[in-house]
Amino acid sequence: MAVEIPNKEQILADWEAHPMRRPRIEKVTINIGVGESGERLTKAEIMLQQLTGQKPIRRKAKKTNRDFGIRRGEPIAVKVTLRGPKAYELLKRLLAAVDNRLKASSFDEHGNVCFGIEEHINIPGVEYDPEIGIFGMDVCVTLERPGFRVARRKRKRAKIPTRHKLTKEEGMVYMMEEFGVEIVEG
């Protein structure tokens, strides 16, 4: 069942009147947690590079976990961060893999959204390769407003005021308007 956002019209009117308040995609981060190093991690790395056209980085285990046979510092995951038009185009394909539906609980209080893809072969344009196998992945979309650079720059750094931060509802409205996503309860 689709979720109705009560102040959707008000948010859209605010963006129309103030273009600097309209959100945009800062980055899209794709993570594949394999849970082990070796051949399977290398295959995940190859698959992620084919999907994004960018070289992924390896993520290391923070703690030793004997039950899973993981040592601290051992590479167990790969991730890639996309920005700009590349991120926008890939996000369209990734949303198609989940039928353009996102849970309301997938959004955090700052409007960012994360969702999972169970099998990478669900993404349009991706063929099954028996050499690589099938991998699932986590996709995190970070949204920002124009002007967020003041928090990251080296000189004259400043905090983002609360009134300029994104809300959960604004993140939902942005995804609905920009990508035609249906937000469901959950």
Swiss-Prot record:
Q: Does the keyword Aminoacyl-tRNA synthetase apply?
A: no
Cellular component aspect of the GO annotation: ribonucleoprotein complex; ribosome
GO terms for biological process? translation
Name the domain of life: Archaea
Q: Which InterPro entries match?
A: Ribosomal_uL5 (IPR002132), Ribosomal_uL5_arc (IPR022804), Ribosomal_uL5_C (IPR031309), Ribosomal_uL5_dom_sf (IPR022803), Ribosomal_uL5_N (IPR031310)
Entry keyword set: Ribonucleoprotein, Ribosomal protein, RNA-binding, rRNA-binding, tRNA-binding
Q: Which Pfam families match?
A: Ribosomal_L5, Ribosomal_L5_C
Can you name one GO molecular function term for this protein?
structural constituent of ribosome
Q: Where is the signal peptide?
A: none
Cite the SUPFAM superfamilies for this sequence: RL5-like (SSF55282)
The text of the family note is: Belongs to the universal ribosomal protein uL5 family.
The UniProt function text for this chain reads: This is one of the proteins that bind and probably mediate the attachment of the 5S RNA into the large ribosomal subunit, where it forms part of the central protuberance. In the 70S ribosome it contacts protein S13 of the 30S subunit (bridge B1b), connecting the 2 subunits; this bridge is implicated in subunit movement. May contact the P site tRNA; the 5S rRNA and some of its associated proteins might help stabilize positioning of ribosome-bound tRNAs.
Enumerate the HAMAP family for this protein: Ribosomal_uL5_A
- How would you summarize the oligomeric state and partners of this protein? Part of the 50S ribosomal subunit; contacts the 5S rRNA and probably tRNA. Forms a bridge to the 30S subunit in the 70S ribosome.
Q: What is this protein called?
A: Large ribosomal subunit protein uL5
Instruction: Please report the organism this UniProt entry assigns to the protein.
Output: Pyrococcus furiosus (strain ATCC 43587 / DSM 3638 / JCM 8422 / Vc1)
